[in-house]
Curated annotation (Swiss-Prot):
Single GO MF descriptor: UDP-xylosyltransferase activity
Phylogenetic classification of the source organism: Eukaryota, Viridiplantae, Streptophyta, Embryophyta, Tracheophyta
Record's protein name: UDP-D-xylose:L-fucose alpha-1,3-D-xylosyltransferase
Residues exposed to the Cytoplasmic side: 1-35
Organism expressing this protein natively: Arabidopsis thaliana (Mouse-ear cress)
Region listing for Disordered, in residue ranges: 1-21
Tissue: Expressed in roots, rosette leaves, stems and flowers.
Amino acid sequence: MAQKQQTLHQQRPFSSSPRSYSSISNRPIFLLSRNGLLLVLLALFLLLGVFLPWPGSPLLLFPNKVSSPSYASSLSPHAKSEWRNYTLAQAAKFVATNGTVIVCAVSSPFLPFLNNWLISVSRQKHQEKVLVIAEDYITLYKVNEKWPGHAVLIPPALDSKTAYSFGSQGFFNFTARRPQHLLQILELGYNVMYNDVDMVWLQDPFQYLEGSHDAYFTDDMPQIKPLNHSHDLPAPDQNGETYICSCMIYLRPTNGAKLLMKKWSEELQSQAWSESIRFKANDQPAFNLALNKTAHQVDLYLLSQVAFPTGGLYFNDAAWVKETKGKHVIVHNNYIIGYDRKMRRFQDYGLWLVDDHALESPLGKLQ
């Protein structure tokens, strides 16, 4: 990690300290002289620059967004500018280990969930592969302040004020960009694992990525499957639909995986959010359409249900959880809507790690 940090700073010199103006302060200032007046005006300008946002800064662009002092950043304007110019290619190169990147997409209201997920990832020794795709500037600055190089923002930034609910227009806008992000990483030549941050790792998932398939994914249906179930894409139901989750995906940089991401993006672009279909207004239906339309061209692999259970099974069938104890790898806190309800459920099941184990996260305690 130390070597990575050194490389990062060699490529992009950062400084969180204000520029020194000692040479100015040592110069004589004569009252009413032209030079003295200019220096007084310069000092006033610098003073205002420290305490007021400059035009075009995130603070001015989003005056109501930085409302939580707990996520305020101490980065200097220069450092913020450097992180705004940080590219996905730079970020992926920095975090990739053995050609693999682990990606999540986060807006600032979900920083506690990011931290909770990171604790679980760190326990499996895979945190250095993590790249946080920040959906707002608060997240970009906070993550890179605490953990330099591990967050990147791909413009445009989304509204950072709201924790989007499943089915809302904001949630649709948030998730609709996902296949493009993943495709860009594949085009750079990396394997990529995507996770939602309302997940917790209980074991190392990489040992379950058997073979060399193009794409790996999980079933979102809560109906119990046999332990030795097929790893093929499930057959569509009577409505012609499959219910694969877009929450946990692993992709290799193959033509098949790239084709799947392109088709997913096309399906998303062909649908628009509306109130009448708001409970389907997320990227998952489009992902399933893309899977079914490319199934004969892409090498697909359905991951084990017992290892990667949907929240509709794990949190609703205590008997099954007991029978399969020790076999669970990643638990997804879905089949529930609402930030507070998700947090309470994690707490009820002993999976909310932030309160007692924050120091195990690369971000530490978020303040």
